[in-house]
From Swiss-Prot:
Transmembrane segments: 15-35, 40-60
Keywords for this protein: Cytoplasmic vesicle, Endoplasmic reticulum, Membrane, Transmembrane, Transmembrane helix
Protein name: Vacuolar ATPase assembly integral membrane protein VMA21
Role noted for this protein: Required for the assembly of the V0 complex of the vacuolar ATPase (V-ATPase) in the endoplasmic reticulum.
Assigned protein family: Belongs to the VMA21 family.
Motif mapping: Prevents secretion from ER: 77-80
UniProt keyword Nucleotide-binding present: no
GO cellular component assignments: endoplasmic reticulum membrane; endoplasmic reticulum-Golgi intermediate compartment membrane; ER to Golgi transport vesicle membrane
Domain of life from the UniProt record: Eukaryota
GO term, biological process aspect, one: vacuolar proton-transporting V-type ATPase complex assembly
Ranges facing Lumenal side: 36-39
A Pfam family: VMA21
Amino acid sequence: MAAEIPTSVIQKLVFFTGAMIIFPIFTFFVCQYLFSNNALISGGIAALMANVVLIGYVVVAFTEDTSSLADEKVETKKDI
């Protein structure tokens, strides 16, 4: 009894997982280059970018249309 997860949900999860890994690391090293090896500033900005990615994921998750999924569940219950 595996749950059927829509492919759009998996695609969003994979995208934001990659963004959570790549974006803060990229930001850290760019800031290291720009601010002449100041690890405190680079780390702080990288942490901020990780939070931006997380907030973006939450916003996308809340705005996702789930009404079609609920309709499919009701239809399958009627068929039984």
